[in-house]
Design a protein with these regions (language model features):
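Catalytic cores of enzyme domains
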Residues: 44, 51-52, 80-168
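Non-catalytic, usually N-terminal nucleic-acid engagement modules in DNA/RNA processing proteins
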Residues: 1-84, 88
Length: 168
């Protein structure tokens, strides 16, 4: 059996798979990761913006968060901040790799959830609510500081999500 592949003759333990998947996220640089309550997302998100609208056989939504800027980054001029201020891309890179890891290791279709806008509804409407995924995965809570989520230990984070047909 190749490294990082399951034995298809033995039953899959969802708890072991979940632990390995969340461990992958942390190893790759996420500060927090969790599995969101898919039923709650489907109930809360508006039609056309639910995970099953993009991936009809989705069974799990994995959410991960990476740290925001350092305190020092907030003190530099804007032109300097444009080069090193955002860690958002790191979250997307981890999620992209995670989708491939889940497919390779668990033979379950997976997709990196795009944070992009809905091309039919315009620039103020996201295709999916990455914040909703993070909140329902327990890695962020709504803040009085604005339309953001905060983690109790890490504060402001950037989030990304992966949809998979693997039931966790």
């Amino acid at each position: 059996m190749a490294k990082n592949q399951i034995d298809i003759d033995s039953p899959l333990d969802p708890n072991e798979a979940k632990e390995a998947i969340l461990g992958y996220c942390l190893k790759k640089g996420a500060l927090a990761a969790g599995v969101a309550d898919l039923d709650a997302i489907e109930r809360i998100a508006p039609a056309g913006h639910r995970p099953s609208d993009l991936m009809p056989r989705v069974k799990s939504v994995i959410s991960l968060g990476v740290g925001g800027q350092t305190q020092g980054a907030w003190t530099v001029p804007a032109k300097a901040l444009t080069f090193f201020g955002s860690t958002e891309g790191r979250a997307y890179s981890i999620a992209y790799g995670l989708a491939f890891m889940v497919e390779r290791a668990y033979l379950a279709r997976s997709v990196y959830c795009p944070p992009d806008i809905d091309p039919e509804l315009g620039s103020r409407v996201p295709l999916q609510s990455i914040k909703l995924h993070a909140e329902l995965a327990g890695i962020g809570a709504r803040s009085l500081a604005g339309d953001i989520l905060l983690h109790p230990e890490y504060g402001y984070m950037y989030f990304a999500s992966v949809f998979t047909e693997l039931e966790l």
